[in-house]
């Protein structure tokens, strides 16, 4: 295996016009690449590997080209109507799409069942390194679950904030039942959204909760994800 990371550049183009832009620049070569598939195409004379993937909830491509062609590809996409965006925009989009981020919502301390990915855990393969552990976890009820959070009061559920049971007015500080792992303001749903882990018994859709936002217990609700679906 040869590592070619430093020999290549990758630019992601995402959004409702992304596929059309790439299709026009590749003379239709990209049109046969289906969602979650990889193919090759020439984009304005640049040999490229295209992955019909992304982390925004939008359709589009992640385009890999030789490193010395990265600037040319960037300029070509801009001249064709693409607009630059940074990680802040990407983070809002992936949250709206309900896509968890490793390092925030997933980690080496997370198991696939509490994160909602149990259906993808295969542990029947012979000599599987993690098979016994996954099987043991699958046979017990998890203490917590990853859920979608939607603010019904005014505030943003930022990463690290404590999630409390809904007990406004009955105690000075309601019981802590979890913690926010990702959160932002969503212009699409016009409000604060996020993800977090809560005790299993509070994980049902529709459960009312409060989130401690700088000392204020702001009302929120457990909701299904995605918050908004584009494709």
Residue ranges and their predicted role:
Residues 1-231:
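Conserved, structured C-terminal
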């Amino acid at each position: 295996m040869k590592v070619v990371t430093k020999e290549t550049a990758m630019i992601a183009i995402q959004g409702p016009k992304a596929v059309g832009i790439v299709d026009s620049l590749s003379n239709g070569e990209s049109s046969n690449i289906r969602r979650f598939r990889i193919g090759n195409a020439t984009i304005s004379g640049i040999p490229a590997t295209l992955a019909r993937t992304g982390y925004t909830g939008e359709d589009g491509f992640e385009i890999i080209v030789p490193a010395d062609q990265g600037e040319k590809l960037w300029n070509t996409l801009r001249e064709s109507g693409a607009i630059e965006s940074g990680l802040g925009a990407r983070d809002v989009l992936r949250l709206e799409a309900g896509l968890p981020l490793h390092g925030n919502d997933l980690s080496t301390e997370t198991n696939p069942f509490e994160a909602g990915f149990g259906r993808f855990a295969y542990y029947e393969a012979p000599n599987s390194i993690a098979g016994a552990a996954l099987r043991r976890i699958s046979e017990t009820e998890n203490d917590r679950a990853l859920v979608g959070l939607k603010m019904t009061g005014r505030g943003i559920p930022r990463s690290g904030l404590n999630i409390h049971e809904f007990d406004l007015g009955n105690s000075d500080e309601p019981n802590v039942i979890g913690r926010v792992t990702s959160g932002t303001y969503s212009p699409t749903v016009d409000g604060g959204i996020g993800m977090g882990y809560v005790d299993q018994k509070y994980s049902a859709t529709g459960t009312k909760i409060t989130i401690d936002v700088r000392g204020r217990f702001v009302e929120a609700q457990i909701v299904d994800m995605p918050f908004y679906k584009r494709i």
